[in-house]
UniProtKB/Swiss-Prot annotation:
The keyword Zinc does not apply. CDD domains: HATPase_TopVIB-like, TopoIIB_Trans. Keywords: ATP-binding, DNA-binding, Isomerase, Nucleotide-binding, Topoisomerase. Homodimer. Heterotetramer of two Top6A and two Top6B chains. ATP binds at N46, D78, T99, K100, G109, Q110, Q111, G112, I113, G114, I115, S116, K471. Its EC number is 5.6.2.2. Relaxes both positive and negative superturns and exhibits a strong decatenase activity. One of its GO terms (molecular function) is DNA binding. This is Type 2 DNA topoisomerase 6 subunit B. It comes from Thermococcus gammatolerans (strain DSM 15229 / JCM 11827 / EJ3). GO terms for biological process: DNA topological change. It is an enzyme of class 5 (isomerase). InterPro entries: HATPase_C_sf (IPR036890), Ribosomal_Su5_D2-typ_SF (IPR020568), Ribsml_uS5_D2-typ_fold_subgr (IPR014721), TopoVI_B (IPR005734), TopoVI_B_transducer (IPR015320).
Length: 561
């Protein structure tokens, strides 16, 4: 039998970077076309977030240069605020690092992996460092960055500084990557940028394809979205570990002040209520009879906490013990006590979390984006009121519907999460499931596969429940599914009204032409019978027909209004 020391001879601690180097597919780097799209997506996402946080209308330029077979140079440049020199290695060379991953805030990226994952993928396929040119308005920093995968750290292998007389600010990154392919497919870079332009009408996006062709998606709105606001965690959406770790880091003087100051919807009065619930749970757990225990838990769930407490002799002593716990320093809160607090939260009723931190695209901007890129004959948008899922995580659903015009025949679903296009794993996405559940025939769409129709769905949240680290599919959460259905049906009813009016107008045009067809013959006959001029009679009937159908159209317009 081998000794333990021999078995553990190969034991090694693996860094986060090393793990993702071996499992790049988890980040979306799987398949040659998808890998290139993922690379561009990570860079463009960073650029959009940076520009918006600085209040700058984004100007983003993407250039794909073919260097050889399945070998490309990818350049992404923006006019954002730039990156301070000391943060360059952290931004581009360290996994799980960023300005938003640790905060309860809406953002396109959530994990702090994105752009550093792109740098790593370029490095492991080409062996080359990523060139970064950036400035905050002072001197221009040019740095070549690599990732030390063993240490999960970025390192600058070469650096130069240049004067900046024009005060340029922004970031340009150049990544050399192999084993990827540029194609104009619906999973490629062109399609990704087109969809990004629809959901971000305030952005000007340019693409230079490998053949040198320049494609421009001009901005159709000058309104830069307000930067998202960090939101305090809601009691219904936290784990014991969250409370325990936050308590160790807080600067508040007592557990009571900590709960009031660092969670939403908790007041002094709510802490007093929490004390009663924690005390009641402590007492219930001491009851030997399981049946009685279950009855007491049920009463607690109904909010009968005072009655439950009064059913125990000497309950005031336990209440005082819990009240004392609330006044001690948070750093002295034990795991068990944090567990008691979180368990009590489950029985308590709280107001829904505030939703002021959510930043939807907005109905007007959705319509601008769809009109500017797709050129439809009809467009409408619906932004649903904010809701919560999993008890305390706020989210919002918005839908855009575009029909006809330059849209080719066939139904197209455009999926988004926080304005970011989701191009892959559509089958497992809640947006696809909700769209498929709609009976489109009820809304005058008889043959969905032949109808020129585009449905856009955007799910907005501080925490989008993705199905995996690749962030290309949203999990099937009941609350989100139901909101998507309601939004689609609202938009579809508007389309139904438009199509009904269109069909009526076509019918009236056909009737009008039929009447006009017989006017010359009637005019000739009446001219013979009455002696009146044939031209005069014909003009009379044509004017009468025109005025008759014009009045019908006016009535129809006023009814629709």
């Amino acid at each position: 039998m081998a000794e333990a020391s021999q078995l553990f001879k190969e034991f090694k601690i693996q860094s986060v970077s090393e793990f993702f180097r071996r499992n790049a597919a988890m980040l979306g780097y799987t398949g040659k076309v998808r890998s290139l799209t993922t690379l561009v997506h990570e860079a463009v996402t960073n650029s959009l977030d940076a520009c918006e946080e600085a209040g700058i209308p984004p100007y983003i330029r993407v250039e794909i240069e073919e260097l050889g077979r399945e070998h490309y140079k990818v350049v992404v440049e923006d006019n954002g605020p730039g990156i301070p020199e000391k943060y360059i290695t952290h931004v581009f060379g360290k996994m799980l690092a960023g300005t938003k991953a640790h905060r309860n805030i809406q953002s396109r990226g959530q994990q702090g992996i994105g752009i550093s994952g792109a740098v790593m993928f370029a490095q492991i396929t080409s062996g080359k460092a990523t060139r970064v040119i950036t400035s905050t308005g002072d001197e221009i920093i040019e740095a070549w960055v690599k990732i030390d995968v063993d240490k999960n750290e970025g390192k600058i292998v070469k650096k130069e500084k240049h004067p900046n007389p024009d005060g340029w600010h922004g970031t340009r990154i150049e990544l050399e990557v192999k084993n990827v392919k540029y194609m104009r497919s619906k999973q490629g870079v062109y399609w990704y940028l087109k969809l990004t332009a629809i959901a971000n009408p305030h952005a000007h996006i340019e693409l230079i394809e490998p053949d040198g062709k320049l494609i421009v998606f001009p901005r159709s709105s000058e309104e830069v979205p307000e930067p998202p606001v960090e939101m305090k965690p809601h009691p219904k959406g936290v784990l014991t570990d969250d409370v325990y770790r936050m308590a160790k880091k807080t600067k508040r003087q007592s557990v009571r002040r900590f709960l009031i100051g660092e969670f939403s919807r908790i007041s002094d009065k709510k802490v007093d209520e929490l004390i009663e619930y924690v005390a009641a749970l402590r007492l219930i757990k001491k009851v030997g009879d399981k049946k009685v225990q279950e009855q007491l838990y049920e009463r607690l769930m109904k909010g009968e906490v005072k009655a439950v407490l009064r059913s125990f002799r000497g309950y005031t002593k336990v209440v005082k013990q819990v009240a004392k716990m609330m006044e001690k320093p948070p750093e002295k809160l034990t795991w068990h006590e944090a567990e008691e607090i979180v368990e009590a939260f489950k029985y308590m009723k709280f107001l829904a979390p505030p939703t002021h931190g959510l930043r939807p695209i907005g109905e007007e901007n959705i319509e601008k984006g769809l009109k500017g890129i797709l050129k439809p004959e009809f467009v409408t948008a619906v932004t649903r009121p904010p809701k919560v899922y999993s008890g305390g995580i706020p989210f919002q659903v918005e839908v855009g519907l575009a029909y006809g015009g330059e849209i080719p025949s066939g139904f197209e679903l455009l999926r988004y999460a926080n304005r970011v296009p989701l191009l892959f794993d559509a089958g497992s996405c809640v947006t696809t499931q909700a769209a498929r559940s709609i009976d489109w025939k009820r809304y005058k769409v008889d043959d969905l596969d032949r109808t020129p129709l585009v449905l856009m769905i955007n799910v907005v949240s501080v925490h989008v429940p993705y199905t995996g680290t690749g962030k290309q599919s949203i999990a099937s959460v009941d609350e989100i599914y139901n909101e998507i259905r309601l939004a689609i049906m609202d938009a579809a009813r508007r389309l139904q009204t438009y199509l009904s009016g269109k069909h009526r107008r076509l019918y009236q045009v056909k009737r009008k032409k039929t009447f006009e067809k017989y006017v010359p013959e009637i005019a000739r006959a009446l001219s013979v019978l009455t002696g009146e001029s044939e031209e005069k009679i014909r003009e009379y009937f044509l004017n009468f027909i025109e005025s008759h159908f014009a009045s019908k159209e006016a009535v129809e317009v006023s009814e629709n209004a």
